[in-house]
Design a protein with these regions (language model features):
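Charged, amphipathic alpha-helical segments and their flanking helix caps
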Residues: 1-29, 77, 89-135
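Small/polar-rich, solvent-exposed N-terminal microdomains that initiate assembly or binding
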Residues: 1-86
Length: 135
């Protein structure tokens, strides 16, 4: 009934979202510091630090740091087009074969970006670099 396919659309979108925030830098005490970025919830990172079996071992978090995670997927009816509308695509393996495909179904992906900073000025520098990308 169904033909197997995997276009990696979700994976590519998650990577593109992370690329927006990769390489942010802040200025601290006259030197430029790169802000590390991780994929996954902040709570998981903090829980891993707290579950250290050696209680005498000092642990430290490198601050500032950012993390992001994919939190949800919802259908977006406002971008829906007619379900019978089709478009033609060429087969990537053989450029001569033309296939018809139905219009894709619109979904909205939700992400959460967390920023952990020791100083308020560090957080403001990060936010000021992020906000111009969004309306």
């Amino acid at each position: 009934m169904f033909e197997y396919f995997y276009n990696e659309i979700f994976r590519k979108t998650i990577i593109a979202f992370g690329t927006l925030f990769n390489g942010l830098e802040i200025q601290q005490e006259g030197s430029v510091t790169r802000v590390p970025l991780a994929y996954g919830p902040t709570q998981k990172f903090l829980a891993r630090i707290e579950q250290t079996p050696d209680l005498n071992k000092p642990t430290a978090i490198t601050l500032p740091r950012m993390s992001f995670e994919f939190t949800g997927l919802t259908y977006d009816a406002s971008r829906k087009v007619t379900t019978t509308q089709q478009f033609t695509v060429k087969d990537p393996t053989d450029g001569k074969i033309v296939k018809k495909a139905y219009m894709p179904v619109p979904y909205s992906m939700q992400f959460e970006l967390s920023i952990m900073c020791k100083l308020n000025d560090d957080a403001l520098q990060i936010v000021e670099q992020i906000l111009p990308y969004f309306q």
